[in-house]
Swiss-Prot record:
InterPro entries: Ribosomal_uS10_dom, Ribosomal_uS10_dom_sf, Ribosomal_uS10m. Belongs to the universal ribosomal protein uS10 family. It comes from the Eukaryota. It is found in: Mitochondrion. It comes from Rattus norvegicus (Rat). The keyword Mitochondrion applies. One of its GO terms (cellular component) is mitochondrial small ribosomal subunit. Coiled coil: none annotated. The gene is Mrps10. This is Small ribosomal subunit protein uS10m. The keyword Protein biosynthesis does not apply. Component of the mitochondrial ribosome small subunit (28S) which comprises a 12S rRNA and about 30 distinct proteins. SUPFAM superfamilies: Ribosomal protein S10 (SSF54999). PANTHER family: MITOCHONDRIAL 28S RIBOSOMAL PROTEIN S10, SMALL RIBOSOMAL SUBUNIT PROTEIN US10M.
Amino acid sequence: MAARAACVAVCRRLQQITTSDEPDTLYKRLSILVKAHDKAVLDSYEYFAVLAAKELGLSIKVHEPPRKIERFTLLKSVHIFKKHRVQYEMRTLYRCLELKHLTGCTANVYLEYIQRNLPEGVAMEVTKTQIQQLPEHIKEPMWETVSGEKEETKS
């Protein structure tokens, strides 16, 4: 009796799943640029993102762009003593994760998962490169249409 109830529950869930005839978008590349000020947090998040990609069966490449250092020099005193200054420094570390040849559904699931687990102090920029069909007016070679027009004007 319990097996029948479980089977009925599964059938109800299957009826709730909707499918669409709309084709899924294809992405040639998905670039994720992750920025942070703390190296340990960035390393940990990179490990998490790579592990999540491997679990989904995605091929991923990681490279580390050079860090950016911003320095600010300010006077210690507001009104006098120009000789006495203070320097502040902000170091921003970057990691670039690149995934290739993804479907739109897979990309959305992966991005939602890693964005929900984004730690504090880490920023993320996502760039999607979509694959699309050529428009009809570009598919036909241009030199064939130009030569046909020249023949019409000559006669």
